[in-house]
Design a protein with these regions (language model features):
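N-proximal low-complexity "stem/linker" segments adjacent to membrane-targeting elements
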Residues: 1-44
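Short, acidic, metal-binding catalytic loop of nucleotide-sugar glycosyltransferases
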Residues: 43-52
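A conserved acidic beta->alpha catalytic loop
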Residues: 44, 59-68, 88, 110
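Glycine-rich, basic loop-to-helix element that forms the pyrophosphate-binding segment
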Residues: 85-101
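Cell-envelope/extracellular polymer assembly enzymes that use nucleotide-activated donors
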Residues: 23-26, 54, 198
Length: 232
């Protein structure tokens, strides 16, 4: 039986589809010392209205109980995969996690943050309406660890590559196509700052970006970073 390529699946079925051998969407999570937030994070991805989705996690050498939490809750989960590597920093952890992904559309989620249930579906609708898009991103809100609101994130209303050349205007939640990501060199593992900014600048050379002016992502603000290379 000839199978239709997964990136041509009909839009009408995305919210009721069950996961296939090759999922339509992969959410990647670079994780570092996030034992208290990783379950909320992963569950927000699994609870998307789009169920044709997997979650790929790279545990970046966490020194707390992050790995134990993942093993306890997700070892046998059919839609979650995780691996552990030596602590190497956010860029390598992100590359490792993206390289685990099997989906055509890739979503970025930090291990201390969480999604609104319709985040993936809204982004997919934009991708499906314009095949030239390589990245779709939404607006986020900033929250405390307990989920209480700090403020809605700054919102640049429309994508502008000229504006992107001067500052990072791409808010979470962000999704991109794996095909476009492979054209870039991925996340630059030789730098420690502005890792996302560097990658999305490269991605903007590949194709079109689209902003959705809706809050779909909860960004936790605190002193720790998602994945930080340990200092000797």
């Amino acid at each position: 039986e000839r199978k239709i390529p997964y990136f041509y699946r009909k839009l009408a079925s995305i919210e009721t589809a069950v996961i296939k051998t090759i999922p339509l969407v992969s959410i990647y999570i670079p994780a570092y010392n996030c034992q208290d937030s990783i379950i909320r994070c992963v569950e927000s991805a699994l609870n998307q209205t789009v169920t044709d989705l997997e979650v790929c996690i790279c545990n970046d050498g966490s020194t707390d109980k992050t790995l134990e939490v993942l093993e306890e809750h997700y070892t046998d989960h059919p839609r979650v995969r995780f691996i552990t590597q030596e602590n190497s920093g956010i860029a390598k952890a992100s590359n490792t996690a993206v390289n685990m992904c099997r989906g055509f559309y890739i979503g970025q989620l930090d291990s201390d943050d969480y999604l609104e249930p319709d985040a993936v579906a809204l982004c997919l609708r934009e991708f499906f309406s314009d095949r030239n898009l390589v990245c779709v991103y939404t607006t986020n809100r900033n929250v405390n660890k307990d989920g209480s609101l700090i403020a809605d994130g700054y919102n640049w209303p429309e994508f502008s590559r000229e504006k992107l050349m001067t500052e990072m205007i791409l808010h979470h939640f962000r999704m991109f196509t794996i095909r476009a990501w492979k054209i870039t060199t991925g996340f630059n593992e030789t730098i420690e700052n502005a890792v996302d900014y560097d990658m999305y600048l490269k991605l903007s050379e590949v194709g079109k970006f689209k902003h959705i002016n809706k809050i779909c992502y909860n960004r936790t603000l605190h002193t720790e970073n998602t994945s930080i290379k340990k200092l000797d």
